Amino acid sequence: MTTPGPMEAAAMAGARWPVSVKGVLGWDGRIVVLRNHRGEWELPGGRLESADKSPQDALRREINEEIGLDAEIGPLVDSWIYDVEGKLVLILTYACEAPQPEALSHSDEHTDVRLVTPAELADAPIPSGYLSSVETALAGC
């Protein structure tokens, strides 16, 4: 008998996973990323809340809260499981569009915000699932 992996063990225990929605948003071949308090770069977005009517509404709200932009939420481009310090989170990533601001700002949920190329992301401390999401979104889904 094989030992179950973390997803199988969580499912067998009846665990409920949080869901996080993220957006691939950028201009001129550069993508918006935010540095979280763990020192990782991530895409803008966050967890679904009970008042959200859909994952897209949650993402629209989160992008506005985190970087102050009113984004158009496009198609789902990726889904993956992220193990955040022993807690499994389902990540749903959408392609997004918004008018480019003169400058980017971030909320106190993050320590930095940048526009980076996909090549710059390859060497950054960023979960591999985000890299896959960016690649898929830029390839046109």
Protein language model annotation of sequence segments:
Residues 23, 76, 94-96:
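A structural signal for short, well-ordered beta-strand segments
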Residues 25, 33, 96-98, 115:
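Conserved hydrophobic "DFG−1" position in protein kinase catalytic cores
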Residues 1-22:
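Acidic, metal-coordinating catalytic segment for phosphate/diphosphate chemistry
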Residues 95, 105-137:
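NUDIX/MutT-family hydrolases
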Residues 80-103:
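Active-site-adjacent beta-strand/loop module that shapes the phosphate/pyrophosphate-binding cleft
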